């Protein structure tokens, strides 16, 4: 695996906003060397593109720049840097797959021309990406890295129960749940709910416990020992509100063990497949599936995806890499991820670039 100990400076080159076809304002940031192959970084739900650009550690944009790649950091509508998790119209992951990711790719291609474009996606961002790809909305990508989950979501029984309770019992009463316990206050009508969600866990920080029991659906989102203390102290900045309106779609995907379309009766979403696995033959680029060996959020979803794709679609160039001792989010925000994780990504990009040359 590539040795990635150097720490070059990485100034922001460009930041701009764009509006999707359904009227949602999103942002893209470009960093890294000019005229280099481009890598679109797609974050998970309720975090933001900042998970890829942490100043306290050597992050993936540092590593990609040192390896000769240009990073494009997307904040899609599920970003905590944007207002849509707390206000604005409800959305599903169909909207991310149909609008956010394809239109971000189109904006990037306007600027890079015919240079190779890769995508590195995490968690829900990777689930939505799988819908976009199997809809044929992202032709000609040079390669894709999906971390944690891709086409075949799989969660624990306890997480399944939490998603059910969140969507059926709380969804009609609560619009969103804050990750930052300090925003709730002692006299809020939701204080007891937040106290219940954050009462368990080894960490004394209530926000950390909320992150695990909220976004993690009761599972650990990361291994504590892998986080820099400065990153842990900023969890309230890195995580935002949890919109409960997305839970029914997530539950439907988990029950199907596949990325599926939610809006099956709405013609506006007709371009998306009802079941992404049934259209996996539309994947036209190499795919690297990554997962931590201790991923409690999605268990062995990506190992399952590798096995299913290898059996059903042997023509797809897919490989699976498991990162020993890592959980879920620490594969990107862990203080040692530059040494333990990112080298696998760079090796994949380099190998694919060599084939294209």
Residues of each region from the PLM?
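Catalytic active-site module of serine/aspartate enzymes centered on a nucleophile-bearing elbow/loop
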Residues: 312, 316-357
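Alpha/beta-hydrolase-fold enzymes
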Residues: 110-114, 124-261
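N-terminal cap/lid segment of alpha/beta-hydrolase-fold proteins
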Residues: 2-32
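Glycine-rich "HGGG/HGxG" loop immediately N-terminal to the catalytic nucleophile
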Residues: 74-91, 329-331
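Short beta-strand/loop motif that positions the catalytic acidic residue
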Residues: 283, 289-291
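Alpha/beta-hydrolase active-site loop
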Residues: 90-110
């Amino acid at each position: 695996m590539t040795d990635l100990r150097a720490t070059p400076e990485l100034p922001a080159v460009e930041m701009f906003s764009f509006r999707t076809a359904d009227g949602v304002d999103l942002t893209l940031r470009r960093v890294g060397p000019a005229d280099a192959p481009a890598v679109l970084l797609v974050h998970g739900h309720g975090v933001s593109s900042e998970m890829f650009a942490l100043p306290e550690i050597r992050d993936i944009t540092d590593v990609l720049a040192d390896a000769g790649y240009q990073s494009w950091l997307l904040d899609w509508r599920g970003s905590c840097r944007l207002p849509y998790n707390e206000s604005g119209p409800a959305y599903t992951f169909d909207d991310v797959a149909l609008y956010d990711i394809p239109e971000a790719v189109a904006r990037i291609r306007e600027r890079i021309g015919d240079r190779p474009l890769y995508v590195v996606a995490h968690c829900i961002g990777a689930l939505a990406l799988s819908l976009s790809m199997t809809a044929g909305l992202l032709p000609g990508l040079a390669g894709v890295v999906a971390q944690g989950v891709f086409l075949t979501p799989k969660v624990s029984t306890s997480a399944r129960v939490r998603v059910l309770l969140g969507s059926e019992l709380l969804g009609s009463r609560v619009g969103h749940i804050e990750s930052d316990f300090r925003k709730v206050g002692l006299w809020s009508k939701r204080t007891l709910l937040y106290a219940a969600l954050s009462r368990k866990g080894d960490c004394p920080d209530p926000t950390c416990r909320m992150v695990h029991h909220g976004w993690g659906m009761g599972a650990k989102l990361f291994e504590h020992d892998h986080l820099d203390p400065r990153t842990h102290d900023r969890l309230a900045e890195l995580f935002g509100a949890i919109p409960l309106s997305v839970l029914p779609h997530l539950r439907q995907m988990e029950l199907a063990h596949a990325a599926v379309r939610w809006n099956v009766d709405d013609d506006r979403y007709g371009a998306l497949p009802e079941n992404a696995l049934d259209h996996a033959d539309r994947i036209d680029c190499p795919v690297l599936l990554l997962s931590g060996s201790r991923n409690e959020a999605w268990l062995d979803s990506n190992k399952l995806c590798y096995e299913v794709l290898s059996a059903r679609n042997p023509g797809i160039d897919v490989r699976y890499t498991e990162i020993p001792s890592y959980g879920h989010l620490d594969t990107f925000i862990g203080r040692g991820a530059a040494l333990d994780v990112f080298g696998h990504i760079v090796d994949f990009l380099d190998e694919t670039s060599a084939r294209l040359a």
